[in-house]
């Protein structure tokens, strides 16, 4: 997969703080790789951000894209004819009860008795599903991801017009994708979402 960075991506990276450049280019490189596999005609399309910061393929609103990184973990998603969101999260070593109550709501009592490590892991899985949903919706944190009901241990669910999937059987690092249940108005050939 190792390829030279896309010229458009290098230009954007040049304006970023030095500490963010490598992370940014790694995320864009993985996204470009997934685009080459799923929508090859869009692999070199410039990427811009909408008013809320959501990445979009310039001139192609019908192909949803999403990028997430946490530390060295990177995840991307592409949806033909769909809005998509992806989130990857490294578990925190310590999770206060107040954060569990905030993000898990009525399910917090199921996680509080767990070991510190398991609490961090389970919160990370729940958070990735919540965050993937608001990324797909294009609202980010203003969409109050912590208010989305994701029961601990869940592998899939629905929130509004979005379906989310946690890749618990495929990833050791908490990773979830969300995608719209309805199509973008376009001439896209059916619905298809891919998460990597």
Regions found by a protein language model. Name each.
Residues 1-196:
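Core catalytic alpha/beta fold that binds nucleotide/phospho-ligands
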């Amino acid at each position: 997969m190792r390829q030279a960075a896309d010229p458009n991506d290098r230009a954007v990276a040049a304006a970023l703080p030095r500490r963010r450049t490598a992370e940014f280019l790694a995320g864009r490189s993985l996204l470009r790789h997934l685009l080459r596999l799923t929508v090859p005609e869009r692999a070199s399309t410039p990427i811009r951000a909408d008013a809320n910061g959501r990445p979009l393929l310039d001139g192609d609103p019908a192909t949803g894209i999403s990028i997430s990184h946490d530390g060295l973990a990177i995840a991307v998603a592409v949806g033909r004819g769909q809005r998509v969101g992806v989130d990857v999260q490294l578990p925190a070593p310590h999770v206060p009860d107040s954060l569990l109550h905030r993000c898990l709501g009525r399910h917090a009592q199921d996680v509080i008795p767990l070991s510190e490590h398991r609490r961090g892991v389970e919160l990370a899985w729940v958070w990735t599903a919540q965050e993937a949903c608001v990324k797909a919706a294009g609202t980010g944190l203003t969409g109050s991801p912590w208010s989305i009901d994701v029961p601990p241990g869940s592998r899939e669910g629905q929130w509004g017009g979005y379906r989310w999937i946690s890749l618990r059987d495929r990833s050791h690092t908490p990773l979830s994708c969300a995608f719209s249940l309805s199509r973008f108005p376009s001439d896209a050939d059916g619905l298809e979402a891919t998460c990597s």
